[in-house]
Amino acid sequence: MREIIHLQTGQCGNQVGTAFWQTIHGEHGLDQDGVFRGSDEQQSERLSVYFTEAAKQKYVPRAVLVDLEPATMDAIRSGPLGDFFRPDNMVYGQSGAGNNWAKGHYTEGAELVDQVLDVVRREAEACDSLQGFQITHSLGGGTGSGMGTLLIAKVREEFPDRMMATFSVLPSAKVSEVVVEPYNATLSIHQLVENSDETFCIDNEALYDICRRTLKQAHPSYGHLNHLVSRVMSGLTTGFRFPGQLNADLRKLAVNLVPFPRLHFFTVGFAPLTSSASFSNLGIAELTQQMFDPKNVMLASDFRDGRFLTCSTMFRGKVSMKQVEEQIQAIKNKNSANFVEWIPNNIQTAHCSVPPKGLDVSSTFIGNSTAIQNSFRRVGDQFSLMFRRKAFLHWYTGEGMDEMEFTEAESNMNDLVSEYQQYQDAGMDDEYGEEYEDEAPAEEE
């Protein structure tokens, strides 16, 4: 089977990751201890993608949990999934990274990384045919961003031909907890452009908005936000976990969604998102409408400001694929300005008959939209405001970093923004398009 090893780093990464395992272990009919109690063959058919069978029918997640302080692991151990993870797979330091990317990437994190790689190697050896890795982390703190990107680089070095997917929580303007977020995020994006194959971008601001506006929760907690993210992650990985045709592994997903290697940052959305009483049965039309509604997208950049290069949708439950195709076509015709015309058939639809827990039908949306440059631009602007004054820089140079790295990261992110802009402007037969076609291969290197 095509296995995926899951890594979760830092406080945010571990909480999001644990919420993901909480969601999928239920979908596959496993109880809190990992014993299979499902009734449906589809639940067990591809269990081994994310789980490895330990003793007597007990399944254990292929997960490696990493943090630079013990508190997160203690919380997981005492939580409902405490006995679910393999204890040897929890690797943690004592000192924390103090929201400092350099600590996570160069000092504290670098000391711990070999221990983590040993666990990753052991997990990889237990796989028949490893397809790749997925990592959950945030880009605003120290461990998830600094050590997370270090881990991605090291794993990449050791498994160069395997896929690397990341679920990255971007810092957002309204919900800011750390003053150096723009530094940490820019340094991380600099790494992700080079070392990740697909990055699903999520930000807290959009999650808060969804909780408040759509789910009518007055004071959403991180638990609510993580639940939302886990719903989306469960939807995104449906194709890998259940028998299906489209996007059945990480590589096929990337082939369908990444037109140019650097442009692999996706926005994600989920439907139905309604306050619980009213979602009993939504039709295909409402699902599709909701899924393509910017309010349901988990990133605070409105995709109507840009154009979709590619899209992929996953419907779950009892739905008629004919209706789905018609709805998607209708959306594409109605909003044709939001899709680039030089990639024909750029919306893919997939279907899986197993619905998520508690819902009859659901749909998940992945879009590669040029509007994501707005999120990068926002981080970049904050970065330059601070970097021009060299504010807080001593925290980073004190850990052995050089200012040059900041300059490089900034210009790499600016390049990324202008690449997205360039493909947004490129038309079918304007001169731009032809110029880009000549240039594109050189740029991809």
UniProtKB/Swiss-Prot annotation:
Its cofactor is Mg(2+). Residues 422-445 are annotated as: Disordered. It is found in: Cytoplasm, Cytoskeleton. It comes from the Eukaryota. GTP binds at residues 11, 69, 138, 142-144, 204, 226. Its main location: cytoplasm. Keywords: Cytoplasm, Cytoskeleton, GTP-binding, Magnesium, Metal-binding, Microtubule, Nucleotide-binding. This is Tubulin beta-1 chain. It comes from Colletotrichum graminicola. The lineage of its organism: Eukaryota, Fungi, Dikarya, Ascomycota, Pezizomycotina.
